């Protein structure tokens, strides 16, 4: 079973990806992890990717797809995998389809932009320990300081509202079109078509896990 998880940054994909991976005993495949592994192992594709990255350029879809195919050939993928952050664009989705890489489920976790901004911009971190708080949902005992050490908490640059809005803009331009792409793919795919589902990513983590399990049990 091969699964693609879609959703904007901050929609909760990371938490649910870990849940799906452990529940179905399938690896979570990240293009970033694949790139790092290929570079560290010195594979031909890894060396090619390193050359491109060292030149400050983006790694091509051709290289990424080559890495995906290499990864899928490994024994831990024999029962399937969960794609994390791939595909990001229609071109990458087309490349998957053209290479006859079968996808079984696409799950879109839907959360409104303003809810995502509230979630992400409210995060505060204790840099030394990594302890994470949220000004609304998990506030420290004393505003602005770590519960254990009393050190000041910080807001990571990635969590600043302006940065979050920019990331959401990129998502809506580049990745959100995949939702309609896979919805159409499901309609036109015949008896072996993939299953496409949209779930609301609001509510408790456990309630969202339950929604995901229902997709696979129906």
From Swiss-Prot:
Pathway: Purine metabolism; AMP biosynthesis via salvage pathway; AMP from ADP: step 1/1. Its main location: cytoplasm. One of its GO terms (cellular component) is cytoplasm. GO terms for molecular function: adenylate kinase activity; ATP binding. AMP binds at residues 31, 36, 57-59, 85-88, 92, 156, 167. It comes from the Bacteria. Residues 122-159 are annotated as: LID. It holds the Pfam family ADK_lid. Keywords: ATP-binding, Cytoplasm, Kinase, Nucleotide biosynthesis, Nucleotide-binding, Transferase. It catalyses: AMP + ATP = 2 ADP. ATP binds at residues 10-15, 123, 132-133, 203. Catalyzes the reversible transfer of the terminal phosphate group between ATP and AMP. Plays an important role in cellular energy homeostasis and in adenine nucleotide metabolism. This is Adenylate kinase. The gene is adk.
């Amino acid at each position: 079973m091969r699964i693609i998880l879609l959703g904007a940054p901050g929609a909760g994909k990371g938490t649910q990806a870990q849940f799906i991976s452990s529940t179905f005993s399938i690896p979570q495949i990240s293009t970033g992890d694949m790139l790092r592994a290929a570079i560290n192992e010195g594979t031909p594709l890894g060396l090619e990717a390193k050359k491109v990255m060292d030149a400050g350029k983006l790694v091509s879809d051709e290289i990424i797809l080559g890495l995906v195919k290499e990864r899928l050939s490994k024994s831990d993928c024999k029962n399937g995998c969960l794609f994390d952050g791939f595909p990001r664009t229609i071109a990458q989705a087309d490349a998957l389809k053209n290479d006859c890489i079968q996808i079984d489920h696409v799950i879109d976790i839907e959360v409104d932009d303003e809810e995502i901004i509230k979630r992400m911009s409210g995060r505060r971190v204790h840099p030394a320990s990594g302890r994470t708080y949220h000004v609304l949902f998990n506030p420290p005992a004393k505003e602005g300081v770590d519960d254990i050490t009393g050190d000041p908490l910080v807001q990571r640059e990635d969590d600043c509202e302006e940065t979050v809005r920019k990331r959401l803009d990129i998502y809506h331009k580049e990745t959100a079109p995949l939702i309609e792409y896979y919805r159409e793919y499901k309609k036109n795919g015949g008896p072996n078509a993939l299953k496409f589902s949209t779930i609301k990513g609001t509510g408790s983590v456990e309630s969202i896990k339950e929604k995901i399990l229902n997709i696979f049990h129906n």
